[in-house]
Amino acid sequence: MDELTSQALTAFTTRYCDAWHEKHNSWPLSEELYGVPSPCIISSTSDAVYWQPQPFEGEANVNAVESAFDIVIQSAVHAFYTTQFAGDMYAQFADEKLTLLQTWSADDFRRVQENLIGHLVTQKRLKLPPTLFIATLENELEVISVCNLSGEVCKETLGTRNRTVLAASLAEFLTQLKPLL
C-alpha cells in the first residue's frame, strides 16, 4: 500500500472531523447516508447519521478493477480506497470545491469497484488514457481523478481528453485539501 497516500488521507480526514467538531461540536453528520449500514455510524437522528471514520476491513486492494482489465492500478488508488471507511467529505483544492469520495462499508467498496470498472470501460471504448475517479465536482460532467499512467491527479471532463493536472501525486493533492463544511 502507498503509505504516503494513506497518511495524507488520514491527516485530511482528521482535519475534516476536527473542523466539524469545532463548528458543530459533534462528529460529521450526513443525510445522504441515512439508512445505509456502516461501521462508521455512531448515532442516528430521524433523517441523518453521525459518523466517525473506521479502519478499512477486508482485502486492502482494488484487485477486482485490476482483474477486470488485466492492468496494474496505481498503488495510491489502492491506498485511497482501502485506508478507511468514512463518509464523503467536502473539500476545496485551490479554487475547486469538491466532494472527496470514500467507501462507507464493505458493500459500498464493492459498488465503488464496479463504478471504477464502468468508468474504465467507457474510457477504453473512447480510447482515452485510464483514470480512476476520487472526487466529484458541482459540474456533473467533471471529476477529480488519478491518471493510472502517471499517478498525477487531474480535473477531467468525462468522455473527453480535457484534463488539467492539479497535483503530481495523490498524497500531494490530499495534503493540500482544505475542509469545507
Swiss-Prot record:
Which UniProt key words apply to this protein?
Cell inner membrane, Cell membrane, Membrane
Pfam families with a match to the protein in the record: Syd
Which CDD domains does the protein's record reference?
Answer: Syd
- Indicate where this protein resides in the cell: Cell inner membrane
One GO CC term on file: cytoplasmic side of plasma membrane
Bilayer topology annotation: Peripheral membrane protein
Record Gene3D superfamilies: Syd protein
Q: Which InterPro entries match?
A: Syd, Syd_sf
Among its keywords, does the record have Iron?
Answer: no
UniProt lists the family membership as follows:
Belongs to the Syd family.
Give the protein's biological function: Interacts with the SecY protein in vivo. May bind preferentially to an uncomplexed state of SecY, thus functioning either as a chelating agent for excess SecY in the cell or as a regulatory factor that negatively controls the translocase function.
Q: Name the chain's protein.
A: Protein Syd
Q: Which organism is it from?
A: Citrobacter koseri (strain ATCC BAA-895 / CDC 4225-83 / SGSC4696)
